[in-house]
Amino acid sequence: IRGTDSLNNMEQITIKNPAAGVYNLLVNGTSVPFGPQDYWLTYEYNYEDITLTYPIGGEGLVPGEFELIRWDAPQDSLPCVLEYTTDNGQSWVIITSSTSINTNFYNWQVPSVISDEVRVRISRNGISDESDANLTIVDVPNVSVSWICPDSIYVNWSTVAGATSYEVSMLGQKYMDSMTTVASNGNTTQSALILNPNPNVLDSWFSVCAKKNDSRGRR
């Protein structure tokens, strides 16, 4: 909130849309007990840059679900244009052209397509930013464990449209460790037999993510 501050000994002022030229700053002390007193002046420039902060690349999105597109930008009410591509930037589809830039987010319904060449772009007044790398849109398989033996584990899952392979992971000491990757065979269900790396562990966590070429979907 803009206003005069005569209480604190550190003050911030802003100049919106400054014109080119020379600026003079006059500093007057308020309730100074004795003087004169030294002071310091620092400044910075805030440009009209737009930074897309999500999705930035590598994410796995699910067709039909809602995702919050997020960005950082100057705080004004001018509209921005949000777009996405599913063919590595050869063509772009407009998501919206009427969202104010100062909302900093937009609730986007992910399109019902399968692609590993997806990016999101935001633009305004000739300034734009887009995802740093491609993201993937593909469904999430339903996974179950048929049986666990001291030496092996049998995992199966429902297949999803457009997947070229499936990555099976198991919880390690801290992270989900990739155990194997199985090529898609076109069936409605698939399975994998993996060696049990922790035969003394009585329970564990498993996940299966669909892959489109080398890109992972959500687990």
Which role fits each region the language model picked out?
Residues E67-A73, W108, V155-T159:
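Aromatic/hydrophobic beta-strand junction motif of beta-rich domains
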Residues I1, T14-V62, I137:
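C-terminal edge strands of extracellular/lumenal beta-sandwich accessory domains
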Residues I137-G162, P199-N200, D214-R219:
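Pro/Thr/Ser/Gly-rich low-complexity, intrinsically disordered linker/stalk tracts
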Residues V27, I122-R124, A210:
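Conserved structural position at the C-terminal beta-strand
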Residues Y23-L25, V118-V120, F206:
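Hydrophobic beta-strand segments within extracellular beta-sandwich modules
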Residues E83-T86, S123, S169-Q173:
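Conserved Ser/Thr-centered positions that define the repeating blades of beta-propeller domains
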Residues N17-A19, P111-D116, I194-D203:
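Surface-exposed, short loops/turns at beta-strand junctions within beta-sandwich domains
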Residues Q90-Y106, E167-V201, N213-D214:
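Recognizes extended acidic, P/S/T-rich segments that occur
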